[in-house]
Amino acid sequence: MRVGKKIIFSLISIIVALIAIFSVYIYVSVPIPSNSQNKIVQISFDDVYLCIKDLKDTLRYTSVFQQPFFKSLKELHDVYGAVFSLYVYEKADNFVITEVPDKFRNEFIENSEWLKFGYHAIEPRFDKKEQSLEFERSFLNVRKSILHWAGKSSLAPCLRLHYYFADDSMIAILKKYKVYHLLGADDEGRISYNLNRLQSDSLYARRAYIYDSIYYILS
């Protein structure tokens, strides 16, 4: 009986010790809440077109932020200071970005400090050969369209391309138009853009990698 009590007491002691260790781990792992007025959460979305298509097609909207998706972004910005980059298709389904009107241009410009737009791909269907051959034309179409309906200040300085694909010719085009920052793959073992396996692994390990004047950042 006495031996049994000792075993139970030992087990309880071990459990208490494990709880204490776990509590200390949680305490040191979770960041201390900040009262700073300069807190920023940066969030980015790929494959964007439905919210922009809705703005184009729904005539009753008198503000960007009547559209449900943009309304949600505005609420997150107002409450948490979140800033957003939306990476858009040139075309998808019945959407063509060159058809977007400039109805909300001034409002986009007024909110461009926290809401940006950038190129993502020609369309959802991914074809490496087409994406490479048509890249400059498609990139400029999207860029000019964003300038038309959202203004220069709404252009995202950092891009994330479809499937993290960009060969050397596409990278050269990006540099031609002063784009020097790319968001890379966030999963281990995946190739990002024109980086080789070793370089992509370094990007994953270090969270950032500079190669040939391009600054690659882990998504």
Regions found by a protein language model. Give the residues of each.
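Alpha-helical scaffolding within the catalytic cores
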Residues: 67-72, 96-109, 144, 194-218
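Structured segments of extracytoplasmic/periplasmic soluble domains
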Residues: 75-80, 145-149, 177
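N-terminal Sec-pathway targeting helices
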Residues: 1-17
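Hydrophobic alpha-helical membrane-insertion segments, chiefly the h-region
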Residues: 17-25
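Active-site beta->alpha N-cap acidic-glycine motif
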Residues: 27-108
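An acidic- and aromatic-residue-enriched active-site/binding cleft used to recognize and process polar
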Residues: 46-48, 89-91, 122, 161-164, ...
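Active-site-adjacent pocket scaffolds in enzyme catalytic domains
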Residues: 18-19, 31-32, 153-154, 163-219
